[in-house]
Amino acid sequence: LKPLIDYVVPRMKDVGITEGRVLMARDPQQMMSYLRRGKVDWVTETPGTGLLLADRAGARPLLLTERSGSREYRSVIFTHRDSGITDLSQLLGKTIAFQSPSSTSAYLVPALALRERRLPMGLMVSPLEGREPGSVGYVFANTDANLAAWVHKRLVDAGGFSDQDWDQLQRVSEAFRRDLVVIHTTDPVPRAMELVSGNMAPAVEARLKEVLLGASTDPQARDALRQFFRTTGFYEADPASQAQLEKLRRGAREIREALE
């Protein structure tokens, strides 16, 4: 993160910014605290957590972020090829693994797909916990590698994460490529977003936006962007991406109210 800070700060002297530092948060709750107490000015996040920070800590969306050339991604829900499961409706009475409660593509988006099918869901502490016949049991695997392995070993019946993680899985494991199959692909959501504190001065916000929008065409920013989660550019939300974000915002609220 620091190389991009070092690129941005010298270009903001005209609005009074002369230094910057990186402050890491262990989870979204700590980042909310930082924002409310004025300890953080600029946050980069996946859209699910970014919208949560906007709703609960007053953060303002600034720009959307292109990473590794991708402006959006989807979630996939997959099963073992021998499971006999070919449709989301067949997950009733079964189990699904997600990555973590803060993940957009490996929790919020696939969970929303299940909710849209009106499938009741119940949290499990462990994949070995007994299944409830009238709901979809869900459990957090903590890492994408665990998630895929649990489905492959039949510890759970299904898993959900991003299409980019799925593509990576297909490249690195012949066994996973042979034995796992996607049964559902969601609509796309923006890949990532930049947010600023609700207390940021308008002139500072405008200058930060200007600097970030120009970074992808500035050779001096190339290495800093690469180290910033392989960012390849920043862009303003258009009507289509705004609609995607609003749908995700409503869905995330529903998921949190119903499941958390």
Task: Please annotate each region the language model reported.
Residues 36-45, 94-96, 135, 143-147, ...:
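Alpha-to-beta junction loops
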Residues 44-57, 110-116, 149-177:
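A ligand-binding cleft/hinge motif common to bilobed small-molecule-binding domains
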Residues 1-7, 195-260:
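An extracytoplasmic/periplasmic, membrane-proximal ligand-sensing/linker region
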Residues 1-11, 73-148, 223:
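Bilobed "Venus flytrap"/periplasmic-binding protein-like clamshell domains
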Residues 33-90, 101-102, 110-116:
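Acidic, polar ligand-binding/catalytic clefts
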Residues 74-85, 189-204:
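A bilobed periplasmic-binding-protein/Venus flytrap-type ligand-binding module shared by bacterial periplasmic
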Residues 1-51:
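Extracytoplasmic small-molecule ligand-binding "clamshell" domains
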Residues 60-70, 126, 170-188:
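Short beta-strand->loop
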